[in-house]
Amino acid sequence: MTNPTAAIIVIGDEILSGRTKDKNIGWLAEQLNSQGIQLREARVIPDIRETIIETVKTMSAAHDLVFTSGGIGPTHDDITTECIAAAFGKKVIRHPEAEARLLSHYENTGLEFNAARQKMADIPEDAALIDNPLSAAPGFILENVHVFAGVPSITVSYTHLTLPTME
């Protein structure tokens, strides 16, 4: 039996401009390889809807597993969720469990659970949530695509929760 293959898609204009340094590709590559998952490709792409959709389609067809990093936060340029949904022909829904986790988190921190933060509870239909013990904003898995936040500490958390299920 051959080892599964994987690809990483890092999404964000801030990475391409050099304003933010990517720390997720190298770390995730080490984790995947330690599990016998062969990382075959990594791409850094801009926050452009068509580019995200086409890259996800191409890479999910070519590899057993795809991991995305970035674009699922509360800001206007965080469009990864809607693009992943579009790539698989799914609708984006307000996920009740994700919303409850986020509401509880923001109530406990005393911060307002405003519309921008509520956006982080929007998940493609049929996606499975990935828990986030750091900030409560979940990642998700749709088909063979694992969608992670770009914040390195959250990526580490998501990875520790998802890699054991791939053995």
Residue ranges of each PLM-predicted region?
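Glycine-rich phosphate/diphosphate-binding loop of Rossmann-like nucleotide-binding domains
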Residues: 5-35, 41-42
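Alpha-helical scaffold elements adjacent to nucleotide-binding pockets in ATP/GTP-utilizing enzyme cores
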Residues: 55-59, 83, 101, 158
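Single conserved hydrophobic/aromatic residue that forms the stacking wall/gate
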Residues: 160-167
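Glycine/small-residue-rich loop that forms an oxyanion/phosphate-binding "nest" at active or ligand-binding sites
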Residues: 81-115
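N-terminal small/polar loop signature for handling phosphorylated ligands or for N-terminal nucleophile
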Residues: 26-78, 86, 107
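Internal, active-site/partner-interface "lid" segment
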Residues: 112-142
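Conserved anion/nucleotide-ligand pocket segment
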Residues: 136-158
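Short glycine-rich anion-binding loops that position phosphate/pyrophosphate groups of nucleotides
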Residues: 13-14, 71-74, 152-154
